[in-house]
């Protein structure tokens, strides 16, 4: 049985991470949250007051405090910068609203993409992000591109924030998601777009379990054929 690589891309709050985690657990695969890596770099920039021209300082800080993932007692994923648990810190609104400019820096993308490729080398991995199928793993055996309406994605993010105890306003989130979509799809380095061979799936009004079933069936078919 071949261990394949699954790339799940899509805009903010399209359900990538939720779906990827479930499928990884079902298949016994490793899940890599690439968004958390860019959020960690953004957290470093904000905490130190760094700007675009300080990219080398961000990279130095990442080298001193490497990003790592650990499992909590309940099975959830924890994100660390060095020995600091930043799992909740990188989900705060200030990080969310600044991650686009940090992730658009070519030097940051190059460093994190190299890290992601090293992790994926052995297969049996699911990665979600914005350029997994186009840049990070262009030869992934299965590529999925999830989309959903801005309204639905704002509702998902609102619910997520409330559950995590993060202050949220629906209309503000809606405007922020629309702005993030524009930034992500118009940046010069690795813009958000579906790979030519990706399966595009609109998750608007679709349950998480239905999305999981759709992708997992595709994955199992490829695994069985290998």
UniProtKB/Swiss-Prot annotation:
<dbReference type="InterPro" id="IPR003136">
    <property type="entry name" value="Cytidylate_kin"/>
</dbReference>
<dbReference type="Pfam" id="PF02224">
    <property type="entry name" value="Cytidylate_kin"/>
</dbReference>
<comment type="similarity">
    <text>Belongs to the cytidylate kinase family. Type 1 subfamily.</text>
</comment>
<dbReference type="InterPro" id="IPR011994">
    <property type="entry name" value="Cytidylate_kinase_dom"/>
</dbReference>
<keyword id="KW-0067">ATP-binding</keyword>
<dbReference type="GO" id="GO:0006220">
    <property type="term" value="P:pyrimidine nucleotide metabolic process"/>
</dbReference>
<feature type="binding site">
    <location>
        <begin position="10"/>
        <end position="18"/>
    </location>
    <ligand>
        <name>ATP</name>
    </ligand>
</feature>
<dbReference type="GO" id="GO:0036430">
    <property type="term" value="F:CMP kinase activity"/>
</dbReference>
<protein>
    <recommendedName>
        <fullName>Cytidylate kinase</fullName>
        <ecNumber>2.7.4.25</ecNumber>
    </recommendedName>
</protein>
<keyword id="KW-0808">Transferase</keyword>
<keyword id="KW-0547">Nucleotide-binding</keyword>
<dbReference type="GO" id="GO:0005829">
    <property type="term" value="C:cytosol"/>
</dbReference>
<dbReference type="GO" id="GO:0036431">
    <property type="term" value="F:dCMP kinase activity"/>
</dbReference>
<dbReference type="GO" id="GO:0015949">
    <property type="term" value="P:nucleobase-containing small molecule interconversion"/>
</dbReference>
<dbReference type="GO" id="GO:0005524">
    <property type="term" value="F:ATP binding"/>
</dbReference>
<dbReference type="InterPro" id="IPR027417">
    <property type="entry name" value="P-loop_NTPase"/>
</dbReference>
<keyword id="KW-0963">Cytoplasm</keyword>
<keyword id="KW-0418">Kinase</keyword>
